[in-house]
Amino acid sequence: MKHALPLALFALLLAACGGGRYHGPTAYDLHGQRGAMRPGGDYTVRPGDTLFGIAWRYGLDIQELANWNSISDPNHILVGQRLHTTPPRGVALRPVHIPQISSNGQPGWSWPTRGRVISEYNANSPGGKNLKIGGSLGQPVNAAADGEVAYVGSGLTGLGRAVVIRHGNVFAAYAYLDNIRVKEKQHVQRGQQIASMGIGPQNTPALYFETRQGSQTANPYSYIGTTPRY
């Protein structure tokens, strides 16, 4: 990331994701899944780390992590720097309200692509807190709501090429992509094509779609609804 954004973000654990095609996460890749590491004690910054990525792996809000460690610029951390992964005494995590799941979802949201859900959201699985939608290679992947592009690249481990969009106070990750059509800081509208569907698990076309609000990963159905709308 080159731009400072006041984000509670999806994060970067820089790793090679050859050509943007998904080939299944390695054991190392799984450490990039949100919440794969439990907060507690300090974390020592390693080469290639970003605050964005560290917050992601611990399931934390990047701005809160920055505040706990007196970091004024979330894009500037040093190799060897020790970071507290729990709040100081007397400081609580900010509460997050996630909408209940409904058939229609939230106003202003729609499904990001056409197809059949091939993997449902699983709150008990670090790698399963997302929807995977199967379809046809090259079919349009669209913004699920109006928003601003926060990230474009292949630094989300195990996900190939990805786009993260800030939709108000919700961040959505779209991954397994080909032919990305947007850039960081670009404003997009609901239904606007942002990329094409690439190859997902089992070498079949798919879209990985994950939503996050504050420090919590949320079931995408809370926003897009269980009944497809395009």
Language-model-detected regions and their locations in the chain:
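Zn2+-dependent peptidoglycan hydrolase active-site motif and core
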Residues: 149-178
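Extracellular LysM carbohydrate-binding repeats and other cell-envelope/extracellular binding modules
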Residues: 18-28, 34-44, 53-56, 60-93
